[in-house]
Amino acid sequence: MSGQEKRLMVMAGGTGGHVFPGLAVAHHLMDQGWQVRWLGTADRMEADLVPKNGIEIDFIRISGLRGKGIKAQLLAPVRIFNAWRQARAIMKRFQPDVVLGMGGYVSGPGGLAAWSLGIPVVLHEQNGIAGLTNKWLAKIAKKVMQAFPGAFPHADVVGNPVRTDVLALPLPGQRLVGRHGPIRVLVVGGSQGARVLNQTMPQVAAKLGDAVTIWHQSGKGGQQTVQQAYAAAGQPQHKVTEFIDDMAAAYAWADVVVCRSGALTVSEIAAAGLPALFVPFQHKDRQQYWNALPLEKAGAAKILEQPEFTVEAVASTLASWDRETLLDMAERARGASIPDATERVAEEVSAVALAR
């Protein structure tokens, strides 16, 4: 099979943690001559983001059940069946050689549709604990990969595909050696922000004073409130932005990151070679805790669960990290990363397609 003949359908949606790694693999294979289409939902971020990346997208109607009422749960089998039929019709038209499930609700009916048509299914689990959809699909998949050890007992650990501009950053030894002055603290709560960070970090800044300079991403609608909180704490000099468009530049600026531990965030921080103080989102399966644990075990990060994320604990932790410690942690972070994750996932997809 030549590169010109290969066809891939990527199934991913809902959040950047699913969509961005899928885009990285898609572009890598498109550069090798693959035809790529995307299966997503019309009301989530992939609907805009995927076409902007030059990839055609097909939509099915599916959403999650968590937090829904009894009526929605009773209707779930009908909705899943309808989504499966939609996905099956789309795949019959496109005839992919392989489908790649990167997570999100769309992967469930999409993976079942591919399997019912004899199209091999490849899965990539971004998180340290497998989601329900991927647990089901793993039973029918030809290949299962995981970003962090432990999500599946026997799956290959391949890392998370991250953006090329993050991978292109200078290594910690080049970037951090010779820095002096206040420790540069990057605070990132994700695109939606994180209330615990927005409420706690201005008080941390007051405790640490001139020892730190902070760049704080507040999330949508939070900039003015967080700026006022820093000013009220006597720390108006710190930079607060609603979003950070160029995360690679922010990582290059930082000495340490204080953030949630979503899968893609953890992988990007490791690839950038940065120490981190993680405050995992409190989810019932502790997904973000398991994402962050490998970097803590590597000596590259510290985890403070949300009840422990107090002004005193955060200030004490940051104050204990001098520049020598931060450089050592940064090098450990980079050493724990898998910078060729995109290539590893793409190679497995190619191998499954060639084995048909």
UniProtKB/Swiss-Prot annotation:
GO MF, one annotated term: UDP-N-acetyl-D-glucosamine:N-acetylmuramoyl-L-alanyl-D-glutamyl-meso-2,6-diaminopimelyl-D-alanyl-D-alanine-diphosphoundecaprenol 4-beta-N-acetylglucosaminlytransferase activity
Q: State the Gene Ontology BP annotations.
A: carbohydrate metabolic process; cell division; cell wall organization; lipid glycosylation; peptidoglycan biosynthetic process; regulation of cell shape
**Chief subcellular site?**
membrane
Is Disulfide bond included in the keywords of this UniProt record? Answer: no
Residues the entry annotates as binding UDP-N-acetyl-alpha-D-glucosamine: 15-17, 127, 163, 191, 244, 263-268, 288
Q: Which CDD domains is this protein grouped with?
A: GT28_MurG
Superkingdom assignment: Bacteria
Q: Which reaction does it catalyse?
A: di-trans,octa-cis-undecaprenyl diphospho-N-acetyl-alpha-D-muramoyl-L-alanyl-D-glutamyl-meso-2,6-diaminopimeloyl-D-alanyl-D-alanine + UDP-N-acetyl-alpha-D-glucosamine = di-trans,octa-cis-undecaprenyl diphospho-[N-acetyl-alpha-D-glucosaminyl-(1->4)]-N-acetyl-alpha-D-muramoyl-L-alanyl-D-glutamyl-meso-2,6-diaminopimeloyl-D-alanyl-D-alanine + UDP + H(+)
- What's its EC? 2.4.1.227
Statement: the UniProt record of this protein carries the keyword Chaperone: no
* Pfam families named in the record: Glyco_tran_28_C (PF04101), Glyco_transf_28 (PF03033)
Q: Which GO terms describe its cellular component?
A: plasma membrane
What family is reported? Belongs to the glycosyltransferase 28 family. MurG subfamily.
Name of the featured protein: UDP-N-acetylglucosamine--N-acetylmuramyl-(pentapeptide) pyrophosphoryl-undecaprenol N-acetylglucosamine transferase
Encoding gene, per UniProt annotation: murG
